[in-house]
């Protein structure tokens, strides 16, 4: 973690200590902030929404969030939405995530910035959008959607798993790590030697975001039969 990000998390620690919200944090930020809070004996609660554990808020009290429906006739992708949102130069801690449910697009955000988002987030790519605040209960039955796959690997090394998903050679996979195409638990990693465990999350640029599932068994040749879940945005 670079110095400016660590300094930012020190500020988030102070906010939590004063009874305010940390904003939405990714997995790496969660790990560091938890260490800081525990080290300084600061009490906190962790709040997640819509089954997403990779974007949570640390706070002493339940924070207020707003759910906005994104109305458009265009077909949008998660990457399009993220790119257009952050083109507004908005702090990532304001946004929980973008979701799809029942053929509709949604986003959930820190309520303090609701009016600003309603006023300024009006376009995704070349497509005009309209935002409307809806009740959180509208998505009470929402759950993250996955495409499940089964792979055979000789070990739980991250590079072995990436090789199976991409069907790339070991040398090509090394290039992916070198070129910063791989993020593990929301941190860029340059080596695939780490051993992953169930529920760990990683992403491969241009391929998608994945979660390590259960071990389904072992083959006679002693390979692991491993479940991998790919996050799906549209259903």
Which residues does each PLM region occupy?
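Basic (Lys/Arg-enriched) interaction patch that binds polyanionic ligands
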Residues: 155-207
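Ferredoxin-like alpha/beta domains used as RNA- or RNAP-binding modules
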Residues: 1-159, 165, 188, 201, ...
């Amino acid at each position: 973690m670079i110095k400016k990000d660590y300094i930012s998390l020190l500020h988030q620690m102070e906010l939590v200590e004063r009874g305010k919200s940390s904003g939405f944090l990714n997995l790496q930020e969660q790990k560091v902030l938890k260490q800081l809070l525990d080290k300084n004996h600061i009490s906190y609660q962790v709040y997640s929404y819509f089954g997403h554990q990779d974007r949570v808020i640390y706070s002493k009290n339940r924070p207020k969030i707003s759910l906005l429906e994104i109305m458009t006739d265009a077909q949008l992708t998660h990457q399009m939405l993220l790119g257009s949102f952050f083109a507004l130069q908005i702090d990532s801690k304001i946004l929980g995530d973008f979701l799809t449910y029942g053929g509709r697009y949604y986003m959930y955000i820190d309520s303090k910035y609701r009016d600003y988002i309603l006023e300024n987030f009006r376009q995704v790519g070349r497509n005009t959008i309209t935002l409307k605040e809806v009740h959180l209960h509208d998505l009470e039955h929402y759950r993250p959607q996955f495409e499940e796959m089964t792979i055979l690997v000789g070990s739980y090394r991250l590079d072995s798993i990436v090789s199976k998903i991409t069907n790339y050679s070991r040398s090509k996979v090394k290039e992916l790590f070198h070129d910063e195409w791989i993020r593990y638990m929301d941190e860029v990693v340059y080596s695939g030697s780490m051993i992953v465990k169930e529920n760990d999350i990683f992403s491969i640029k241009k391929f998608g975001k994945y979660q390590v599932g259960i071990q389904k068994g072992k083959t006679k040749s002693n390979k692991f039969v491993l479940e991998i879940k790919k996050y799906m945005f549209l259903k």
